UniProtKB/Swiss-Prot annotation:
It catalyses: trans,octa-cis-decaprenylphospho-beta-D-arabinofuranose + NAD(+) = trans,octa-cis-decaprenylphospho-beta-D-erythro-pentofuranosid-2-ulose + NADH + H(+). It holds the Pfam family adh_short. Component of the DprE1-DprE2 complex that catalyzes the 2-step epimerization of decaprenyl-phospho-ribose (DPR) to decaprenyl-phospho-arabinose (DPA), a key precursor that serves as the arabinose donor required for the synthesis of cell-wall arabinans. DprE1 catalyzes the first step of epimerization, namely FAD-dependent oxidation of the C2' hydroxyl of DPR to yield the keto intermediate decaprenyl-phospho-2'-keto-D-arabinose (DPX). GO terms for biological process: capsule polysaccharide biosynthetic process; cell wall organization. Keywords: Cell wall biogenesis/degradation, NAD, Oxidoreductase, Periplasm. This is Decaprenylphosphoryl-2-keto-beta-D-erythro-pentose reductase. InterPro entries: NAD(P)-bd_dom_sf, Sc_DH/Rdtase_CS, SDR_fam. The active site is at residue 160. NAD(+) binds at residues 67, 164.
């Protein structure tokens, strides 16, 4: 049995096991029912122990930790095998990523390649593996953290935005590919979220708390949605921006 009798997940895998948004989503699921949590964490991540304790306090029935280096794609099959070794995984949350300094990224080849490797290549790598596992078990929910920055890539953060555009397209397509096998994929496009990663960035309009994103993720998953914005109003903002001609778009202070 995968989900319990009322649709609550029994095992949740968080790839990016110290992600504030990812942990908030796990906490929101645990408010409904206890579950086993598997945290896939970068070796040596200083937030590892705190994340485990956070999940225990939130009501997890068990918390397992597996080492996960996003850039070491050769190790990913073993990581996913280990995560599924204890039985079916009902929900897998893809919530790892880098933000970086926008102006440095397009002028530093090493860092540009690194962020592309983490935000896009690694996301594709684990997505393929999760799809394979969940297809075999005949069920499952993947939640992929995208970004409004990928909807129309802006000059102000185009390296980061381009990686999220790629992730977004991949997971939307993966959802289409897996539909017939009983596996669902939800892509979440948040604007700015109040976390440690964005603490140094000037707060933008429509900024939301991680708890808001978590509530949206769990609710949208239960409804079988494939794509949601956080907040919902961002959808209409980006709908307008997407159709602005490039010469005009270039002059906008965004």
């Amino acid at each position: 049995m995968v989900f319990d009798a009322v649709g609550n997940p029994q095992t949740i895998l968080l790839l990016g096991g110290t992600s504030e948004i990812g942990l908030a989503i796990c906490e929101r699921y645990l408010r409904n029912a206890s579950a086993r949590i598997v945290l896939a964490v970068m070796p040596g991540d200083p937030g590892r122990d705190a994340a485990v304790e956070q999940m225990r306090k939130a009501g997890a029935s068990a918390v397992d930790v597996v080492d996960f280096d996003a850039l070491d794609t050769e190790s990913h099959p073993a990581v996913i095998d280990q995560a599924f070794a204890g039985g079916d995984v009902d929900v897998a949350i893809v919530a790892f990523g880098l933000l970086g300094d926008a102006e440095e990224l397009w002028q530093n080849q090493r860092k540009a390649v690194q962020i592309a490797g983490v935000n896009y290549t690694a996301a594709v790598s684990v997505g393929v593996l999760l799809g394979e596992k969940m297809r075999a078990q005949g069920s499952g929910q993947i939640i992929a953290m995208s970004s409004a920055a990928g909807e129309r890539v802006r000059r102000s953060n185009f390296v980061y935005g381009s990686t999220k555009a790629g992730l977004d397209g991949f997971y939307l397509g993966l959802g289409e590919a897996l539909r017939e096998f009983g596996v669902r994929v939800l892509v979440i496009r948040p604007g700015q979220v109040r976390t440690r990663m964005s603490a140094h960035v000037k707060e933008a309009p429509l900024t939301v708390d991680k708890e808001y994103v978590a509530e949206l993720a769990v609710t949208a998953s239960a409804k079988g949605k494939e794509l949601v914005w956080a907040p919902g109003a961002f959808r209409y903002v980006m709908m307008v921006l997407r159709h602005i001609p490039r010469p005009i778009f270039r002059k906008l202070p965004i």
